[in-house]
Design a protein with these regions (language model features):
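Short, flexible loop/turn elements at secondary-structure junctions
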Residues: 9-11, 74-77, 100-102, 240
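Glycine-rich, often proline-containing surface loops adjacent to acidic residues and nearby aromatics
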Residues: 60, 64-71, 90-95, 212-219, ...
Length: 267
């Protein structure tokens, strides 16, 4: 049995023990994330492509430093996920390990390909969300109608977040949405986002996009997002120290001179 762990652009989690079953890792620039998919033909903003390419190149380096064998499959236009999976099949892999996809098309394609080609498919819990797919389905299927307010209330209870001993919400209310709609005062000073320097991953991604994605939307000169785990942790620290205290107050505020206000720019 030849196993390989499939990793897509939104699954670059910190390396712990999740790859204990195999040393073989496939990093896949799938067209569902990079655009011009054979079925879903939309193009994306060029900064999205830069972000995915830079972070995946960084992750490839980290994996190799940890001793993993990495197969990096680059994005090709007018393709589907199945072509990438077939490439791995032709290399002799017959046991795919994946995270929960959190993408309907991607999940369906992987499952159907595995079934048709006698591939063993093993799915692991994703770190992307606090609640697993199975638990989310179980909660939602209990009611005919299920809105986000009910879901968040259930999350508070099941995770025991800001819940009193008698089961009531801390502060006496389940939602403080009405307090999130303050207007931005003219005199208030809006904190700046951290400024990230250049890196070989960013430079390589920008060059790739400038050559191969000229027809995609937007401009990339203003790109300023964390690309490594260390940068993301620093970005989180800055958010908690400088922005979190007023995030709730101005969560719904907008201003023509400021793009981010007190938001974290994490999701």
């Amino acid at each position: 049995m030849k196993k390989i762990f499939l990793i897509f652009p939104n699954q670059l989690f910190k390396i712990k023990d999740q790859f204990s079953a195999t040393k073989n890792i496939a990093l896949i620039e799938d067209s569902l994330f990079f655009g011009c998919d054979l079925q879903w033909k939309q193009k994306f903003h060029c900064q999205k492509i830069i972000f995915h390419k830079a972070t995946m190149n960084y992750y490839e380096q980290v994996l190799k430093q940890h001793g993993y064998n990495v197969i990096y499959i680059k994005h090709k236009r007018e393709t589907r996920t199945e072509e990438n999976l077939n490439y791995l099949k032709e290399k002799g892999f017959n046991h795919f390990i994946t995270y929960e996809a959190h993408d309907w098309s991607l999940e369906k394609r992987i499952k159907n390909f595995s079934l048709k080609n006698n591939i063993i498919l093993e799915t692991k819990r994703s770190e992307m969300f606090i609640t697993s797919d199975d638990l989310s389905d179980e909660i939602i299927n209990q009611k005919k109608a299920y809105g986000m307010q009910k879901f968040y209330r259930n999350q508070r209870k099941s995770l025991n977040i800001l819940i009193e001993k008698d089961g009531s919400p801390t502060g006496g209310e389940w939602s403080f949405d009405k307090l999130n709609r303050k207007k931005l005062p003219n005199s208030i000073k809006v904190p700046r986002l951290p400024t990230l320097g250049t890196s070989k991953f960013l430079d390589k991604a920008k060059k790739d996009v400038s050559i191969n994605y000229q027809d995609y939307y937007g401009r990339y000169e203003s790109f300023n997002y964390p690309l490594t785990h260390k940068e993301a942790e620093k970005w989180l620290d800055v958010f908690l120290i400088e922005r979190f205290n007023l995030f709730g107050d101005y969560e719904d505020a907008i201003h023509s001179d400021h793009r981010t206000l007190w938001h974290s720019i994490f999701s």
